[in-house]
Amino acid sequence: MSLRPEALKGAGSGTHVAGQVDYRLARNVVVSEFRKGRLSRLDVCDAHPELLRAAMNVGDETREDCPICEEAKVRIVSYVFGSRLPPSGVCVTSKAEMAKLARTAKDLTCYVVEVCPDCSWNHLARSFAISHRR
């Protein structure tokens, strides 16, 4: 699910998105360095097997080709970490699930990762904090 902070509008009273960090500039540098030959495919195609599994089974396919292999479409996977959640976080698969987490947990951080299931490219796309004021 390509989660954005706007998806939480109406998640319940007291839900507040504290800000967003976009990692596009860092991504562009990595892709540029790969294309210049300064980074190898092994350097940039290193997705953990669990991230690949999540991308294939619950990730949202985008219209964007993988910037490394240029053969597959990039998939988006969202993870949430915070109080009252498992240490490994929760892979969020719907806006409704995210809204429920936002209502019940005190403070959360959501990480949105782009993944290529073919070549294992992965990069953090954005992150944002969510707080629940009672």
What are these regions (language model features)?
Residues 1-49:
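N-terminal alpha-helical interaction blocks
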Residues 41-56, 94-102:
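Short Cys/His-rich Zn2+-coordinating modules
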Residues 50-63, 76, 104-110:
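Short, flexible, mixed-charge glycine/proline-rich loop motifs
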Residues 66-69, 116-119:
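Short cysteine-rich clusters marking metal-coordination/redox-active sites
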Residues 72-76, 122-128:
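Short, non-ligating residues that shape and space the ligands of small metal-coordination modules
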Residues 80-91, 131-134:
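Short cysteine/histidine-rich metal-coordination sites, predominantly Zn2+-binding motifs
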Residues 95-110, 122-126:
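Short metal-binding segments enriched for Cys and/or His
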Residues 110-116:
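Helix-rich interaction surfaces within compact, conserved domain-sized segments
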